[in-house]
Amino acid sequence: MSALDTSIRVEVKTEYIEQQSSPEDEKYLFSYTITIINLGEQAAKLETRHWIITDANGNTSEVQGAGVVGETPTIAPNTAYQYTSGTVLDTPLGIMHGTYGMVSESGEHFQATIRPFRLTTPGLLH
């Protein structure tokens, strides 16, 4: 792990979108707001994303692609980039985690870790 691997901090806030969910059809919509903070000394460009999404039944799906929400932002030192996206699960509980493929101002490629976070409907867990 290089110093660049730890120069990016990822914070996550989740929300269950009840009005667009359909529990009777086993469809639970969640939004997640991601804040990517550059704690390093160089600007870093987010080039790719890789998500691993697991529902309460153990079903796993992967999402890979360029950028996030149609953008490949460059995050200057001591600044943050924020976006909101969403996912649909077949269960009222799930977990997401993954990585962002980043490239530093000096051209070094590195991975920013997105630690596991829970997606859950209100009141399901105490």
From Swiss-Prot:
InterPro entries: ApaG_domain, ApaG_sf, Uncharacterised_ApaG
GO BP term (any one): error-free translesion synthesis
Domain ApaG: 2-126
PROSITE patterns named among the record's database cross-references: APAG
Pfam families hit by this protein: DUF525
Domain of life: Bacteria
PANTHER family reported for this sequence: F-BOX ONLY PROTEIN 3, POLYMERASE DELTA-INTERACTING PROTEIN 2
Annotated protein name in UniProt: Protein ApaG
